């Protein structure tokens, strides 16, 4: 359970006891710093690489399991036969992202276990009710550093998820270091390597990857990293995420009957989709004609589903279309990246993932299709409004009554918090950890809204 003081570099000799330098590092293109851990710990079993251990730790984490109860596109149990029978959740999305990322990463020379660990980790910090809950929590947390799902993922991996504890040099008390993943794994899971309001090109961007009180581990992760660049494995994870959710959200929309593929030939429908794409998924100055060309390229494919009736044959054709799309997007990135960097192993900061503009536009159009036909339905907006109320009222109730209502883990952290700002962050951590059902249940118990 215990290790050494956080931030102490792990001597490679400790790691070398179980895996040779040649096998663990040189063979896969990673140096000693990549396999260092925030806190030194002994290896348990010979024959496992550091990144295999990272992947296993994320796979067995309670944070990953909780994603089964968190919204992906539509909340499970909303009277859609398709979603009620087999709803896609944050967990299934993460597993699909991991499969896509692992294969693309391996094709480009990354360690596949490292990329898979990053893909499994990328949504761990998302709160109940998806981006809707994220917005409500960010409003509540405005005066204690805000809330961002990616920053929360890092906080979970490095502090909250109970796996490893070390003795503090100052007080001698046990301090959590989370899953104590390698530097490379934490870096690969860091999609936005900058703090709040420090976006390298857009200071107004709400995206960031670290809270101020998590800066010590973040600075350790980024030691030697060039500026705000994301590592190559994080770029692979990011594209795998885009590919997985753009393709599968459309698949779910077709399966549930919310998307009629024939509508995509009608000009008013197309313009509505392009407006969503320009508003959310592509630069604002993108020419709609480019989006029209991207959509037409997809519609012209022989495997594109031009109808869907739910029959076994239709389901098989739809599944083939999803496979074709995933392959199309991954091969485009693989081919363009290889053309730019050659056939060697591409790892860490040795390269940038090259995704052709055509592939990015096609992916963006798919996101916009799912957004327009699924997420922007009137009943979904009513549901989202109710979800925002649940999160806001739950935050107020916990603020007034904490530590009552907190899980034992967060109760202890609340008692140890130094000031109101720190106590508020604990409440945010508690709410972010809840599943959709658990959030509603706790809200009902604390507010009496049964």
UniProtKB/Swiss-Prot annotation:
Which CDD domains does the entry link to?
HDc
Domain named HD is located at 90-246
Choose any GO biological process term that the UniProt entry carries and state it.
dGTP catabolic process
Q: Which domain of life is it from?
A: Bacteria
Keyword terms of this UniProt record: Hydrolase
Q: Which GO terms describe its molecular function?
A: dGTPase activity
Output the InterPro entries linked to this UniProt entry: dGTPase, dGTPase-like, dNTPase_2, HD/PDEase_dom, HD_domain, PHydrolase_assoc_dom
Q: Which Pfam families match?
A: HD, HD_assoc
Q: Which PANTHER family match?
A: DEOXYGUANOSINETRIPHOSPHATE TRIPHOSPHOHYDROLASE (PTHR11373:SF32), DEOXYNUCLEOSIDE TRIPHOSPHATE TRIPHOSPHOHYDROLASE (PTHR11373)
Q: Which HAMAP family match?
A: dGTPase_type2 (MF_01212)
Family membership, please give it: Belongs to the dGTPase family. Type 2 subfamily.
- Under which name does UniProt file this protein? Deoxyguanosinetriphosphate triphosphohydrolase-like protein
